[in-house]
Amino acid sequence: IALQSPAGAARIRDYLYNELSK
């Protein structure tokens, strides 16, 4: 996943959000 790409950043953000929301 490329951090510089909007889609990649959104995917990582959503993943981290889900992990932290557990």
UniProtKB/Swiss-Prot annotation:
* Name listed for the protein in its UniProt record: Probable ATP-dependent Clp protease proteolytic subunit
Q: How does it assemble?
A: Component of the chloroplastic Clp protease core complex.
Q: Which reaction(s) are listed as its catalytic activity?
A: Hydrolysis of proteins to small peptides in the presence of ATP and magnesium. alpha-casein is the usual test substrate. In the absence of ATP, only oligopeptides shorter than five residues are hydrolyzed (such as succinyl-Leu-Tyr-|-NHMec, and Leu-Tyr-Leu-|-Tyr-Trp, in which cleavage of the -Tyr-|-Leu- and -Tyr-|-Trp bonds also occurs)
Q: What is the lineage of its organism?
A: Eukaryota, Viridiplantae, Streptophyta, Embryophyta, Tracheophyta
Signal peptide position in this chain?
none
Q: Which residues form a coiled coil?
A: none
- Function statement: Cleaves peptides in various proteins in a process that requires ATP hydrolysis. Has a chymotrypsin-like activity. Plays a major role in the degradation of misfolded proteins.
Keyword annotations:
Hydrolase, Protease, Serine protease
> Into which family does the record put it?
Belongs to the peptidase S14 family.
Q: Name one GO biological process term.
A: proteolysis
Q: Which cysteines are joined by disulfide bonds?
A: none
Q: Give an example GO molecular function.
A: serine-type endopeptidase activity
